[in-house]
């Protein structure tokens, strides 16, 4: 994770907020600077290279002893430039600006994936500036907007129908925060009601073709397919998010769209966590709740249909 302030700084003019990308030399200077404790929440002036992120976020950056953002990579500068460009397009009035916005946690891997989409000249995100702004704002958690298929982070499509798209998420070649994990993302193509029969058919497709994976939600109406062995760690992460929001007086909002394909154990566990149940109790639901009979029947039909085709 990393805060917005790890990539951009700002200045206040008479009528609007002006955003600037932070450069890698400024970050490097900040990491070796001695800063008084009461000044660590402020942006650091490097004198030579402009403003650097607040030193309180120094642990977000990679060093020889620590895993973190590779600020010396080209992708760091590209993400910083992208964020500054998009935030300047949004044109935030000075009187509405609050400093806490720079402490907003952004989705770093999501942003690096968006860079790849923008560079792909065949992708609509390459030319559609309005769509690009919205996609970046979603990745920065700065808008309450559903991440539909046109706005999603990856364009490596592995499945698509009238309502849903599954894209593969490959973070292994990332430079900022590489991650070796097999994951997929599910997004809706449009904001229309999806008939139960189509949800069931999609749930059966996932269960049959992605049987090593479970469909989970972090509550923002898009979904991930993660390995069953990773369910517990994802649930722990969401539990920490719920506790953090409660501690800081924020309302945690969870909306999985009540989709038929969401893993039943995940749905039960997160429902309990949102209701105040301890993680130790709620986690027992992760692997104990069975898939609905309707979805199991639809999955069996896929298998029987395939066997019939082979027989013919």
From Swiss-Prot:
Co-factor(s): Mg(2+)
UniProt keyword annotation of Disulfide bond present: no
Binding of ATP, residues: 107-109, 185, 218-220, 224
Positions of the catalytic residues: 222
Its EC number(s): 3.6.4.-
GO MF, any single term: ATP binding
Family: Belongs to the rotavirus NSP2 family.
Quaternary structure and partners: Homooctamer. Interacts with VP1; this interaction is weak. Interacts with NSP5; this interaction leads to up-regulation of NSP5 phosphorylation and formation of viral factories.
Name the record gives this protein: Non-structural protein 2
Organism: Rotavirus C (strain RVC/Pig/United States/Cowden/1980)
């Amino acid at each position: 994770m990393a805060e917005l302030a790890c990539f951009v700084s700002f200045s206040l003019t008479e009528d609007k907020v002006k955003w600037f990308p932070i450069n890698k030399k400024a970050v490097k200077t900040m990491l070796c600077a001695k800063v008084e404790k009461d000044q660590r929440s402020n942006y650091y002036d490097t004198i030579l290279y402009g403003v650097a992120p607040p030193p309180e976020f120094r642990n977000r950056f990679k060093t020889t002893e620590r895993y973190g953002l590779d600020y010396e990579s080209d992708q760091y500068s590209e993400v910083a430039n992208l964020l500054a460009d998009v935030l300047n397009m949004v044109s935030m009035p000075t009187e509405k600006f609050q400093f806490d916005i720079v402490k907003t946690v952004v989705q770093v891997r999501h942003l690096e994936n968006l860079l790849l989409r923008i560079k792909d000249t065949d992708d609509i995100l390459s030319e559609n500036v309005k769509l690009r702004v919205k996609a970046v704002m979603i990745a920065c958690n700065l808008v309450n907007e559903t991440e539909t298929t046109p706005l999603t982070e990856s364009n490596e499509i592995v499945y698509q129908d009238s309502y849903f798209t599954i894209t593969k998420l490959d973070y292994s070649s990332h430079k900022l925060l590489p991650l070796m994990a097999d994951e997929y993302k599910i997004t809706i193509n449009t904001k229309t009601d999806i008939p139960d029969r189509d949800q069931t058919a999609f749930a059966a497709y996932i269960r049959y073709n992605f049987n090593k994976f479970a469909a989970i939600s972090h509550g923002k109406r898009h979904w991930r397919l993660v390995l069953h062995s990773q369910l517990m760690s994802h649930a722990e992460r969401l539990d920490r998010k719920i506790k953090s929001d409660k501690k800081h007086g924020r309302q945690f909002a969870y909306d999985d769209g009540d989709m038929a394909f969401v893993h039943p154990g995940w749905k039960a566990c997160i429902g309990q966590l949102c209701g105040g149940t301890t993680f130790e109790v709620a986690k027992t639901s992760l692997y104990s709740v069975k898939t609905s009979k309707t979805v199991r029947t639809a999955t069996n039909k896929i298998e029987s249909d395939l066997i019939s085709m082979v027989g013919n």
